[in-house]
Amino acid sequence: MTVMLTELNRLVNERRRQKLSQLQNRSESPIQEKEDWLTWELNVERGAPRLDCMAAVVGWREDPDLFHRALSSYSLAKGCVFLLVGVDGDGPEDEEMVNVFNKAYPNHSATIRLDEPLGEVAERTRAKLVAMNQQDDQPINESQIDKMVMQHCVQLAKTILDQHRLAIGGNSRDAIHQLCLQQRHMHKKGIMFTSFVFSLVIADILGVEFLWSSDSDTIVFPDSLSRTIDSIAADANIGGASSGLVVHNAAETVVTRLASTIYWGELYLTRSTTAATATSDCQSGPSSVFRLSALPQILVPWYLQVVMGKRMIINEDRHLTTRLLLKGWGVVYASDVLAATDTPTSMNKWLKQQLRWARATHIESLLMPRVYLKTNPLLFFGMAKREFGPVLAAIAITYYLLTSRSLVPVSLSDIGMRLLVGIFYNIIRNPDRLGTSAWAARKWILPGILFYYIPLPAVHVWSMLTLTADGWGTAMRAEGEKDPVPDSPVVPQFDMGFFIIWMCILAAAAAKWMGCYYSFGLLETAIFMLASSVIVGCTAWRVTVVKT
């Protein structure tokens, strides 16, 4: 079924592109004769949308070389008429990103340092409006208040641009085509909100309909923006889309090689499953497109989301998608379009990234049930499979370890056949060719599958237990992904204890199964289980330590 839905998603996307092509080829002659006026007037409503877009890129203390490569890639991106860069930080260490921006775009560019992040303005304004309504004993209309807050933020952004006397777009000598915004350090959601508000104002000046949103470690290809927009432009009911992703640092370490196969196989198939019905539940942060008309009504509630009494900053991508779906907008996945992102180079960093993504998934999947009442049932099916499968696996393995009985029947031949079908399909149809010659890259596929699925139950369960833990986002290279300091002491990362414990449980359960299969005695089985747990546990500890 997954393969069929993946193919259906590509077919539906291609049909939208064909519809767009038909709209573009339609005659643009306004009036042939007087009696054709009404016909032309109706055709205007169905005319081809403008495909130009602007791009918004956000980051915090990114590696300078990688950031420069990412910014430079937009100079070749088809259809990108304006680039907005958001830097989350205004301290001395944050100036390097601004310098990189100025180096990448020395002409027709400008930098604005904001006195206050617009997210804080929105929060304060909303609290004031709510207090005024309560003081006057008036009912609180949440949507109306959010609308007023959004209008205030947009007006403030307009005022800031006017104060700096920037000539946005155009062909004049002073025209600005790249703008860098710098604000006090908050979190990724904070700089995204500021960038989105300014994007609405700039897009209105330029007359563009679409916004590409990305991260400071993502490199786009010449057709990444244009082909993603092509997949939604002809359908006015679709508010967002995301493209596929490849890993541009796949050859750096063993971890990055393994992670690249996960993007190749897992991402391509799982994201396509629900996207065939325009109900994709997550627009990837590095490669998302939004219809700008969909953003004003969702940005304030998205930014001010509260879960269990706590403001959420970890689930910016998924919650933005959820808000679009709740407002009736479709969200699709352009699986045949690619952009290149960065992946952590160490096991410790990779597990932390997986934890953050898993927490965001749980919040949106389990705590926002209204979305399933307004969307295709396929979205609920995808959620149930994703949320309960790893939990069941963790319970079943632990249950076997404690009782020597199987909780659920497992067919190894069935699992093997599913893996072979998935691998074979990806080799044939996946637009990502893994970057190198066939065998050199594909020999990592099976290890990559194990690399992903072995820790998955532990990541899934632990992220549920630590649901509201915070973090800026995926760790920037400048914050720990650079080479370690020589001769620095090795210290354990105690927040990886969940992974070490899970590997011990898994090793003990596997040893117990082998002992039963080969008819070991009780003492031999116990010794084998203990030895396996110690060896695997020590290995798991070793691969999660870092240099300080």
What are these regions (language model features)?
Residues A56, L373-G389, E481-I505:
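Loop-to-transmembrane boundary segments
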Residues V3, I262, S287, M312-I313, ...:
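Residue-level recognition of hydrophobic positions within alpha-helical transmembrane segments
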Residues R10-P30, S413-V421, D470-G480, A526:
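Interhelical loop segments of eukaryotic multi-pass membrane proteins
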Residues M4, K385-G471, I501-T548:
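Membrane-embedded multi-pass helical conduit in multi-pass membrane proteins
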Residues L114-L118, T270-A278, I363-L373, A394-V408, ...:
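Short, surface-exposed, charge-dense and proline/glycine-enriched linear segments
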Residues Q18-A384, F388-G389:
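Non-transmembrane catalytic domains and loops of membrane-associated enzymes and transporters
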Residues T2-V12:
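Transmembrane alpha-helices and immediately adjacent membrane-cytoplasm interface residues
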Residues G91, L465-V491:
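Membrane-interface alpha-helices
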